[in-house]
């Protein structure tokens, strides 16, 4: 394949922030033309703001489907742009994220370019009523569009209780959880066999374990 390309890299650091940007520009042979002006960007920004919030943003976009792979700039078949903010405070974790995916394959370009607006996640772990008992709560919400031409919303929750017991014959443990999921499917392809509507699931689970710690000295 004939043509020429230019990759420009820019990096900037300040305070608690960092920006790294790669810009690709080229005049090359594509499947459309002998010479076509094409371009792409791959940029990453990270920062810590406020009271312990970690912010990350990625911008990845290309003006043409194949030139990044064909000329060895990037071998991925899709480019994902996203922005997220996360925070950990003691025994709690928070995450908010939005993303959009650009497919580099013409065959699935209109049906598999997922957009997430947004994804929200919360987790908390705390001691239970007894010394070696732990209680974990996990809650998440998701709006997902254009996933194989489906649009859906999902809410999930996990409530988990676990405990360990020291015995003369080793350590026994149990873990029990209750998982709840609620789905709202509000868009689908005409040919799909799935049905639009709302669905909910409640799933209990229980596991029991035993282990025997062994110490070896030399």
Predicted regions, residues:
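Outer-membrane beta-barrel proteins and related beta-barrel translocases across Gram-negative bacteria
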Residues: 1-218
